[in-house]
A protein has these predicted regions:
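P-loop NTPase nucleotide-binding/switch module
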Residues: 55-89, 93, 123-174
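Walker A/P-loop
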Residues: 98-139, 204
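Short loop/turn elements that form and flank the Walker-type P-loop nucleotide-binding site
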Residues: 15-16, 34, 92-94, 156-157, ...
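Basic, amphipathic alpha-helical bundle interface domains used for macromolecular binding and assembly
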Residues: 168-169, 191-385, 389-390
Length: 390
């Protein structure tokens, strides 16, 4: 009978130079790694006979990954140029992205296209992601092999479902999104304690689970992409707005400041101009075209610092995100105006560094800083509401 985690067990056995016998039900799963030390048995009697030298066991047949064409292309998105640009920067630097806008503006449509901009999984990443998925859904390992994870849990998901748990702690959504994207739609509808539990994994790339029977650490290095309405009714200005500033601010306060600080970019996704959807529109850039720029920017980052900009720590930010003195003074004044924290300042610098890398620039210019500051929609919204209340 098949067991969860077979591909992980087989990989570790092969690494250590040992042989492993796996159930026939797990053959398709372990066949993906094509390991010489892996053998298949369909019954315990066959295992006993093999150990007694009376029966030979076969190696698993090599399994081909299920090929899937790109389903969501960036060229399908009409308008929303700033949203597309923000998605490119997010993919290039490994950043976290928050999309804010009324219902029907294309927030989910944009988010679903980020995987088409990301590089293919390396062998190591593919094994890591498959090992985690095998623990909860072994049947999907072959289908998802070498596919970058894109997890989109419902806002009713419990804390345990999100971060993992159980008597013997199993992986949650954040670990299933390892090496991929965790998409949270209707962000303020999630429980606040569930969202705040994501803060540490976002910083460290792992989650520590401690229960009576076991303590375990799962990898959880994912990109967080989230979408939300700007108010309870979906609008905060114009004829569609039916909320007072107090109601809107109370709605936004469901999200803690420290949690919002984890987003490197927050973009406003507005309603499209009247008539644009009925016009003949020239298709925009394809995902493949944008992906080329993303790959070039990532190559610069790994050549310079051996990691993506999103994962730079404080000393590395000082080393790789240097500014001219005049630009540093300008940025300081901007941060004071927006009321940003030190963490938000560091994330803004990392976004500017990514924009410079997309431009193939060795230095961060004022133009790069200004563009990075323009992706702080949540801060501008909060300032706008606070002014209305004073």
């Amino acid at each position: 009978r098949g067991v969860p985690g077979a591909i992980s067990s087989a990989t570790e056995a092969i690494k250590s130079g040992r042989k492993i016998i796996v159930a026939k039900d797990n053959e398709d799963e372990v066949g993906l790694i094509n390991g010489e030390g892996c053998l298949i048995a369909d019954h315990l009697q066959a295992v006993c006979a093999f150990l007694e030298g009376k029966h030979a066991l076969e190696r698993p047949k090599p399994t081909d990954a299920v090929s899937r064409a790109l389903q969501h292309d960036l060229s399908d998105v009409v308008g929303q140029e700033q949203g597309k640009r923000g998605l490119e920067i997010t993919a290039a630097g490994g950043h976290n992205l928050l999309l804010i806008g009324p219902p029907g503006t294309g927030k989910t449509m944009l988010a679903s296209r980020i995987n088409g901009l990301l590089p293919d999984l390396s062998n190591e990443e593919a094994l890591e992601s498959a090992a985690i998925l095998s623990l909860v859904n072994a049947e999907s390992v072959q289908k998802q092999w070498r596919q970058r994870p894109f997890r989109s849990p419902h806002h009713s998901a419990s804390l345990t479902a999100m971060v993992g748990g159980g008597a013997i702690p199993g992986p949650g959504e954040i670990s299933l999104a390892h090496n991929g994207v965790l998409f949270l739609d209707e962000l303020p509808e999630f429980e606040r304690r569930t969202l705040d539990a994501l803060r540490e994994p976002i910083e460290s790339g792992q989650i520590h689970l401690s229960r009576t029977r076991a303590k375990i650490t799962y990898p959880a290095r994912f990109q967080l992409v989230a979408a939300m309405n700007p108010s309870p009714t979906g609008h905060y200005q114009g004829n569609h707005n039916r909320c007072t500033p107090e109601q809107t601010l109370r709605y936004l306060n469901r999200l803690s400041g420290p949690f919002l600080d984890r987003f490197d970019l927050s973009l406003e996704i507005p309603l499209p101009p009247p008539g644009i959807l009925s016009k003949t529109v020239v298709p925009g850039e394809s995902s493949a075209t944008v992906k080329q720029r993303v790959m070039a920017a990532r190559e610069r980052q790994f050549k310079r610092q051996n990691k993506l900009n999103a994962w730079l720590d404080s000393p590395e930010i000082r080393q790789f995100c240097k500014l001219e003195s005049e630009d540093a003074m300008w940025l300081e004044g901007t941060l004071i105006h927006l009321g940003l924290s030190i963490r938000a300042w560091q994330r803004l610098l990392k976004v500017a560094r990514t924009i410079a890398d997309i431009d193939q620039s060795d230095i961060i210019t004022r133009q790069h800083l200004q563009e990075a500051v323009s992706y702080r929609a949540i801060d501008r919204l909060l300032i706008h509401l606070q002014k209305l209340l004073t």
